[in-house]
Amino acid sequence: MQTLDKHKTVTVSQLADNLHVSESTIRRDLIALDRMGKLCKVHGGATINNSNSYLTLEEDVLTKQDLHNREKTLIAKYAAALIGPEDFVYLDAGTTTYHMLDYLGHTAASVTYVTNGIQHAARLAAMGCKVYLPGGRLKANTQAVIGTEAIRSISNYNFTKGFFGANGISTTAGFSTPDFSESNVKTEALHHCQKRFILADSSKFKKVFPVTFASIQEADIITDMLPDDKYSKLTNVYEAGERK
């Protein structure tokens, strides 16, 4: 990606020579990166992807659990380390925030949590943590509590830190998600957090979904690797992965 960022276009043979791998390996990698929206595969090579991908469909939680696990683990571990004793934390429903529960450590018992994630609440309770679950309607495919009752409950809280997922991140559309009701809950919770963090792997960048729940400037981003430096000019970005 660094070669492509520098030259804007690159051939399969150039990449094979530079990376000392076969052209068939390069072609497979380019196909995968094209599907992730990180570049545009063309005949004989690839070009940089400067445009946003506009998407509407949302995968269910079981499908998401199997995607980008390495990246989610890096992000979750970094995010969990930001939680300190006596924090009052909001955890948004989502697979990356769920990964955080593996790394809460010895401070978990002294922290109070509010989450709209059913799986999150059950796991935190099993760990002996103090956890509150807002009322509302259960969205089956994401296991998230949504609706006006959830928003009303969350509006009473003042969180020290909040950790949120996002389906898409764009410099123009901000942080976005496919569902209006889920977006409203995210927005309400985010506005009641002193510190706000969006947890998103690098595949989420340059993607736009129907509903924006916050602008780029409203939250810091924790990702595995930043695909474009322009985001760091708009907000704080923390990279949990290693640059290659």
Where are these regions (language model features)?
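HTH-adjacent hinge/linker in prokaryotic transcriptional regulators
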Residues: 2-13, 18, 24, 28-90, ...
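A residue-level structural signature of the nucleotidyltransferase/glycosyltransferase Rossmann-like core
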Residues: 112-113, 161
